[in-house]
Curated annotation (Swiss-Prot):
Family according to the record: Belongs to the P-Pant transferase superfamily. AcpS family.
Gene3D superfamilies, per the entry: 4'-phosphopantetheinyl transferase domain (3.90.470.20)
Binding site for Mg(2+): 8, 60
Organism: Anaplasma phagocytophilum (strain HZ)
Signal peptide segment: none
Protein name (record): Holo-[acyl-carrier-protein] synthase
Lineage summary: Bacteria, Pseudomonadati, Pseudomonadota, Alphaproteobacteria, Rickettsiales
GO cellular component assignments: cytosol
Length: 122
């Protein structure tokens, strides 16, 4: 049974501009340590921004699927996006983001945009 769905679209250039303006202050506030470490494999600043844009979209899609928003008991860092050994995107949850049910995540990007779609189900 589907408990919730969420989708979010993020402009990679917007994330790139936020990183340029705020640097680690932005990434440390929004992303988990693992997400930040995973981003270090990208030497190109735009590729790194694309990595973060997809994860930001996934976090937003997840809270939309919950029917909440950030700051209502769920913080962005409570949601960590990574890939399983086969490359499938996964969400790990901590703190206020922990909820009953299973999470399915799909992410993609094209040009300057990243999109994520989340379903919560029993």
């Amino acid at each position: 049974m589907i408990l919730g769905i969420g989708v979010d679209l993020v402009c990679t250039r917007r994330i790139q501009a936020l990183i340029a303006k705020y640097g680690n202050k932005f990434t440390n506030r929004i992303f988990s340590e693992k997400e930040i470490l995973d981003s270090l494999k990208y030497r190109d600043e735009y590729a790194r921004a694309r990595h973060f844009a997809k994860r930001f979209a996934a976090k937003e899609a997840y809270v939309k699927a919950l029917g909440l928003g950030f700051g209502r008991g769920v913080e962005a860092k409570d949601i960590s996006v990574h890939n399983d050994p086969y490359g499938q995107p996964m969400i790990s949850l901590e703190g206020g983001a922990l909820r009953n049910g299973h999470v399915k995540l799909s992410m993609s990007d094209d040009g300057d945009y990243a999109i994520a779609f989340v379903t919560l189900h029993t």
